[in-house]
């Protein structure tokens, strides 16, 4: 039965009719809202598309109007050189007037590592007639070009503001070096990725290429060394790093096999850019291997890019490596066959030293901490349940210890940052196989007591009865890195001791009082026995400086002819004379970690015109 509603005017409605009307109105309203939303969205999208299209057109117009050559070059330079060039590269020239774009466009040029290396030899570049360095500032970045144009611009940093800004990133070639010179020779410069064009109207009698640094001849006192490998060190922190030891890894085996290096690396030297010798030490067990490890002590300014050199190739040289000078915090290689009382404390008499030979044929002496040996001979003076050595000095929590050791037994051996006998036994960052943890070595960090202990099991049987290099890096209270042979990396982030700790090595008597399911233990595995070849302590920060050997090939083309030379030496020039012509020539540097200098000589005085185009990332900000 339908229920009815009677209005004052006498109209009769049913509830069902009202519900249907309400549903109809709701559907209509929702449909209208959806339609309106879609219409507004479409309008906004159309507006955004038009805005982006306008910005794109403005950006393209900006680049097209400001390509090379700009408006301020010498007319002779333009008429006699650039008008003859058939430049295919997409260029952007800073020698233009950008005032018409003020408030509409701003651009930023980001310098790269190759620009910085080229800036290091700015004095040599500016030695060409009338050439000057012009610096452009983009926020915290600076970008330099070298030119004989004498106009300085203040409108390169165009101002722009607002919310609706659109950013475009463009890869373009910028005229990095431009100029003219009259004479019988010219020095041209470029770095990785650069294209060099030059014009000469006289006969070229000689032309050569060489990599360059900011010092014309830093090796005047090293003339008996045939090779010099550049090494770039970058301080990644905004702080000074003084007397900081950096690790340099190189393949001495390949150098030795090719007759370029002594078999014992005795001719290896490290020098700074001025040719001054640097303190260094080479891990002797890595000599004549593909993974030769050298440590060099350097001073680094905040965020500094430092270039040093590894010299080699002198068959009559003998080593000057010195661990004590390289690692002022601590170093010992036990080569004298005694324990230095100024470095170590120990609890036994008659330390056992053993002479041995590495696989590379180099002799060495190591200290043996064999508990059974010292106990059977009654050599232990005190603390008779172990034999140990501990450094007299303690080291703050931003240091690293590195040692070459052999863990012979499966139980009761310790090595690393470990508190002395008068301190808390649980304050430590060590490599250990203390028997409660089972038969495997462990990377362990603990503090205060047994309830605050973190460890990582190193389940590798090769770690026993074989020599390995271990490193423990303490990054304050943040973390501890455990590294084996520069290949296995483990990190612990909890239960880290933040106080000073000595360096200690322990070989303990097996503890029968606690079993933990690992008992019985074979008799020949019960007492600790660890051998130590060498050990040192150095400063440690994170991130560490980046070290790059710039020993790659230098590859460039001269008028299409490819030159490929190994960058083993900065001494040797490369003859490129046969492939140069009278007129316009093109050189493309395809790969080079250092700037390259090209010396061109003619048979008479003549006009030289030259251009170096450098690939760069340019961000163009547009306000449509």
From Swiss-Prot:
Keyword flag Transmembrane: yes
Compartments where found: Membrane
Keywords: Membrane, Transmembrane, Transmembrane helix
Regions crossing the membrane: 10-30
InterPro entries according to UniProt: ConA-like_dom_sf, DUF2341
GO cellular component: membrane
Pfam families for the chain: DUF2341
Domain of life of the source: Archaea
UniProt membrane topology term: Single-pass membrane protein
Name the UniProt record assigns to this protein: Uncharacterized protein MJ1470
Protein's organism: Methanocaldococcus jannaschii (strain ATCC 43067 / DSM 2661 / JAL-1 / JCM 10045 / NBRC 100440)
Lineage, highest ranks first: Archaea, Methanobacteriati, Methanobacteriota, Methanomada group, Methanococci
């Amino acid at each position: 039965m339908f229920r009815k509603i009677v209005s004052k005017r006498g109209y009769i409605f049913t509830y069902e009719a009202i519900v249907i009307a309400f549903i109809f109105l709701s559907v209509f309203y929702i449909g209208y809202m959806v339609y309106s939303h879609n219409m507004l969205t479409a309008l906004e999208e159309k507006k955004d598309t038009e805005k982006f299209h306008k910005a794109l057109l403005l950006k393209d117009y900006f680049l097209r109007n400001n390509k090379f050559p700009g408006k301020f070059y010498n007319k002779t330079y333009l008429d006699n050189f650039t008008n003859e060039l058939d430049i295919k590269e997409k260029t952007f020239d800073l020698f233009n007037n950008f005032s018409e774009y003020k408030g509409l466009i701003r651009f930023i040029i980001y310098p790269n590592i190759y620009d910085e290396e080229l800036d290091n030899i700015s004095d040599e570049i500016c030695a060409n007639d009338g050439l000057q360095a012009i610096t452009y500032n983009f926020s915290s970045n600076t970008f330099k070009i070298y030119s004989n144009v004498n106009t300085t611009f203040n409108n390169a940093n165009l101002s722009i503001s607002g919310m609706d800004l659109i950013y475009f990133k463009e890869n373009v070639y910028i005229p990095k070096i431009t100029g003219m010179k009259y004479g019988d020779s010219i020095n041209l410069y470029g770095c990785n990725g650069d294209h060099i064009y030059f014009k000469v109207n006289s006969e070229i009698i000689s032309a050569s290429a060489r990599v360059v640094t900011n010092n014309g001849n830093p090796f005047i006192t090293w003339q008996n060394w045939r090779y010099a490998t550049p090494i770039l060190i970058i301080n990644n922190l905004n702080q000074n790093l003084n007397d900081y030891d950096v690790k340099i890894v190189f393949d001495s085996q390949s150098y030795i096999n090719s007759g370029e290096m002594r078999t014992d690396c005795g001719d290896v030297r490290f020098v700074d850019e001025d040719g001054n010798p640097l303190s260094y030490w080479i891990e002797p067990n890595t000599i004549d291997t593909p993974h030769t490890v050298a440590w060099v002590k350097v001073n680094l300014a905040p965020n500094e890019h430092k270039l040093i050199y590894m010299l080699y190739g002198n068959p009559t040289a003998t080593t000057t490596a010195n661990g004590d000078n390289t690692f002022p915090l601590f170093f010992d290689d036990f080569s004298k066959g005694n324990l230095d009382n100024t470095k170590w404390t120990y609890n036994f008499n008659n330390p056992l030293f053993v002479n041995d030979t590495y696989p590379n044929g180099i002799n060495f002496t190591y200290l043996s901490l064999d508990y059974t040996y010292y106990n059977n001979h009654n050599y232990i003076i005190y603390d008779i349940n172990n034999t140990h050595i501990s450094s007299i000095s303690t080291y703050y929590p931003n240091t690293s210890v590195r040692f070459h050791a052999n863990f012979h037994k499966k139980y009761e051996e310790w090595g690393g940052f470990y508190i002395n006998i008068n301190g808390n036994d649980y304050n430590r960052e060590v490599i250990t196989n203390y028997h409660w943890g089972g038969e495997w070595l462990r990377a362990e960090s603990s503090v205060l007591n047994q309830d605050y202990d973190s460890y990582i099991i190193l389940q590798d049987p090769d770690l026993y009865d074989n020599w390995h290099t271990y490193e423990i890096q303490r990054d304050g209270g943040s973390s501890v890195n455990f590294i084996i042979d520069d290949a296995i990396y483990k990190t612990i982030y909890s239960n880290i001791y933040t106080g000073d700790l000595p360096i200690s090595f322990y070989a303990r008597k097996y503890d029968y009082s606690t079993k933990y399911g690992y008992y019985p233990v074979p008799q020949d595995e019960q007492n600790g026995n660890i051998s130590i070849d060498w050990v040192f302590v150095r400063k440690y920060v994170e991130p560490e400086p980046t070290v790059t050997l710039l020993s790659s090939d230098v590859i460039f083309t001269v008028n299409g002819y490819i030159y490929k030379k190994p960058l083993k030496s900065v001494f040797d020039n490369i003859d490129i004379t046969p492939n140069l012509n009278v007129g316009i020539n093109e050189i493309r540097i395809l790969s080079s970690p250092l700037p390259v200098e090209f010396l061109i000589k003619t048979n008479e005085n003549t006009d030289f015109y030259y251009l170096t185009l450098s690939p760069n990332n340019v961000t163009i900000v547009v306000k449509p």
